[in-house]
């Protein structure tokens, strides 16, 4: 997606408003989510790479659910199912607050092919269930 896409603009404004920094910069090598990396408690968005706007909210969710004392040094998302669930729940709440469609957040290319199932579960008010 482009930086000027309406969803991207809305998400970037929301993250700025709540104090999660997003900078534009080059990402060397592969990142877990295309074009986005957690670095020093903020997000780096590589405008030269394709990315999904909803992934910005998901990665911001990892920052948001991290202990505030640990955020400034956060550079890697832990492989923790509980943290992943918390980041998913936070990103859904953030999408609602920012006026972002559930299917922009839980897109078809993400969540190991389970984006539609997550979107449907949250739209029903159920959420994904326990880890």
What spans do the regions from the language model cover?
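Auxiliary, metal-adjacent structural segments of Zn-dependent hydrolase domains
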Residues: 1-39, 49-50, 97
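Long, well-structured alpha-helical subdomains associated
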Residues: 47-50, 98-131
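C-terminal capping/extension segments of zinc metalloprotease domains
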Residues: 35-42, 64, 124-131
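Active-site recognition of the HExxH zinc-binding catalytic motif
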Residues: 54-67
